Regions:
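A mobile, often basic/glycine-rich helix-loop segment
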Residues: 1-12
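Adenosyl-5′-phosphate
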Residues: 19-241
Length: 241
């Protein structure tokens, strides 16, 4: 609405574009991007690297049927809406995260890597009976006000020291934003060369250039879409494309 476009979004642009794990500006921009959408689309907005608008701008042929907005978000919408009546939107969001983000991302990367080094990161909590029990718990036991993992922290109050129990989340994210502006920029420039992109026929070179310039100048934090494009280009190069 007028408040979001006229006040909140201009104020958001005044926030610094941090390259760290926590980027307040990126978090607010991501939230605003999905704020007007249905709940299931807001969930997808948090999971995806590209909005449908970004895809339409980037792709050389954005008119494919499977790239239509309703088709892009169809799996998330189906998982979100085809639940028995009753669960809250937050409970449905947890379900989608477990079905998509955990299975196709976190377990594939973090947990395989940690188990390679004999570390148990998440697997003990994925015991079938335990996971089903936790899934049935009321949301208030998982999110208490703004405190996440409420019941888990209560259970470990007499086991872990307060400085461990209540410290801020420390994710496994690598410093992609800084790398793309520094040590990995030559590789990015090589893989995103206009002649290379034109030969592939997948992406519009000028649209990719716009993302690179906005990120490297510090005007925006586009680590997620640029990293996704970079990994795809490395995959294509490994296959002679």
């Amino acid at each position: 609405g007028i408040l979001r476009r006229g006040v909140i979004e201009p104020l958001t642009r005044l926030l610094p574009a941090s390259a760290g794990y926590i980027n307040p500006r990126l978090a607010v921009e991501t939230f605003l991007r999905g704020a007007h959408a249905p709940a299931w689309e807001r969930v997808q907005t948090l999971l995806t690297s590209f909005t449908p608008e970004m895809q339409a701008e980037l792709l050389a042929r954005p008119d494919h049927d499977f790239l239509r907005r309703e088709n892009l978000f169809a799996p998330t919408r189906e998982q979100f809406e085809h639940w028995p009546a009753g669960p809250s939107p937050l409970a449905r969001a947890f379900h989608v995260y477990a079905r998509q983000f955990m299975l196709d991302d976190i377990l594939v990367k973090v947990d395989r890597c940690s188990m390679l080094h004999s570390l148990e990161v998440r697997a003990p909590f994925l015991d079938k009976d335990f996971a089903e029990y936790v899934a049935r718990l009321a949301i208030r036991h998982k999110l208490h006000g703004f405190q996440r993992k409420y019941l888990l922290k209560k259970a470990f109050t007499d086991v872990l020291p307060p400085e461990i129990l209540h410290r801020n989340k420390r994710g496994f994210q690598i410093p992609v934003a800084a790398w793309l502006r520094g040590r990995m920029r030559p590789l990015m420039e090589e893989l995103f060369a206009p002649e290379r992109l034109r030969a592939q026929g997948l992406f519009r070179p000028e649209a990719v250039r716009s993302l690179v310039d906005a990120h490297c100048s510090g005007k925006a934090d586009l680590r997620k879409p640029l990293w996704t494009l970079l990994v795809l280009q490395l995959w294509l190069r490994a296959r002679g494309m």
